[in-house]
């Protein structure tokens, strides 16, 4: 195996976890844009579950919170560089 193959295998074998279940967070506050920026890419799109590692239940809550924050103007809908 080469060095590249070993690093790829390590990334693939890493166990993903839901940070909300681990920390015991039940409510995702849409009025906290700094927290919601962790789940949004540079263009303002919501990141998928496979990248963030959140469970389906909390991914739905995150997307709902991001959409609410966009609606009241705390997060932009589209931008060139958000981070």
Curated annotation (Swiss-Prot):
Disulfide-bonded cysteines: none
Keywords, in A-Z order: Ribonucleoprotein, Ribosomal protein, RNA-binding, rRNA-binding
Pfam families the UniProt entry points to: Ribosomal_S18 (PF01084)
GO CC terms: cytosolic small ribosomal subunit
Superkingdom assignment: Bacteria
GO BP terms in the entry: translation
GO MF term set: small ribosomal subunit rRNA binding; structural constituent of ribosome
InterPro entries: Ribosomal_bS18 (IPR001648), Ribosomal_bS18_CS (IPR018275), Ribosomal_bS18_sf (IPR036870)
Protein's job: Binds as a heterodimer with protein bS6 to the central domain of the 16S rRNA, where it helps stabilize the platform of the 30S subunit.
Family stated for the protein in its record: Belongs to the bacterial ribosomal protein bS18 family.
Quaternary structure (record): Part of the 30S ribosomal subunit. Forms a tight heterodimer with protein bS6.
Protein name (Swiss-Prot/TrEMBL): Small ribosomal subunit protein bS18
Naturally occurring in which organism (per UniProt): Cytophaga hutchinsonii (strain ATCC 33406 / DSM 1761 / CIP 103989 / NBRC 15051 / NCIMB 9469 / D465)
Lineage of producing organism: Bacteria, Pseudomonadati, Bacteroidota, Cytophagia, Cytophagales
GN (gene name): rpsR
């Amino acid at each position: 195996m080469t060095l590249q193959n070993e690093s790829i295998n390590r990334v693939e074998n890493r166990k993903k976890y839901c940070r909300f279940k681990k920390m015991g967070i039940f409510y995702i506050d849409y009025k906290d844009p700094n927290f919601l920026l962790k789940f949004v890419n540079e263009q303002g799109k919501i990141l998928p579950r496979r990248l963030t590692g959140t469970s389906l239940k909390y991914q739905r809550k995150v997307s709902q919170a991001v959409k609410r924050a966009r609606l009241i103007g705390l997060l932009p809908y589209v931008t060139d560089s958000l981070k």
